[in-house]
Amino acid sequence: MIIHVTYLSGYITGIISSIIISAILGLPLAPERPARHSWTPSAIFPAPIIAMGLVAICIKLGVTGMYGGVDLGVVSGLLAALMTAYFLEDIFPRPEDL
């Protein structure tokens, strides 16, 4: 099974914590319009997606946390929000035509 029910709370905690911390760091909640041509990082995308990926990587490596993945979700949400706010455009630069 890809997502085990035991770690579902870790995924949900990662999503919620990444959105809250991203909003605290000053990222907009939604990207600018039109959304399909926007390269603005926001609290809704890509921070929660990165947090879910970090939780999945940690669970696959055997790091499950102490509280059913909730603590792992909070840490991954924090790392995802910091990465989205400060390092995302260094890793993935803006396209030239936008």
Curated annotation (Swiss-Prot):
The gene is ehaA. It is a multi-pass membrane protein. One of the integral membrane subunits of multisubunit membrane-bound [NiFe]-hydrogenase eha. Eha is predicted to form large electron transfer complex and might catalyze energy-driven reduction of low-potential redox carriers (Potential). It is found in: Cell membrane. This is Probable [NiFe]-hydrogenase-type-3 Eha complex membrane subunit A. One of its GO terms (cellular component) is plasma membrane. The chain crosses the membrane at residues 7-27, 43-63, 72-92. Putative multisubunit membrane-bound [NiFe]-hydrogenase eha is composed of at least 20 subunits. The keyword Membrane applies. The lineage of its organism: Archaea, Methanobacteriati, Methanobacteriota, Methanomada group, Methanobacteria. Belongs to the EhaA family. The keyword Transmembrane applies. Its main location: membrane. Keywords: Cell membrane, Membrane, Transmembrane, Transmembrane helix. It holds the Pfam family NiFe_hyd_3_EhaA.
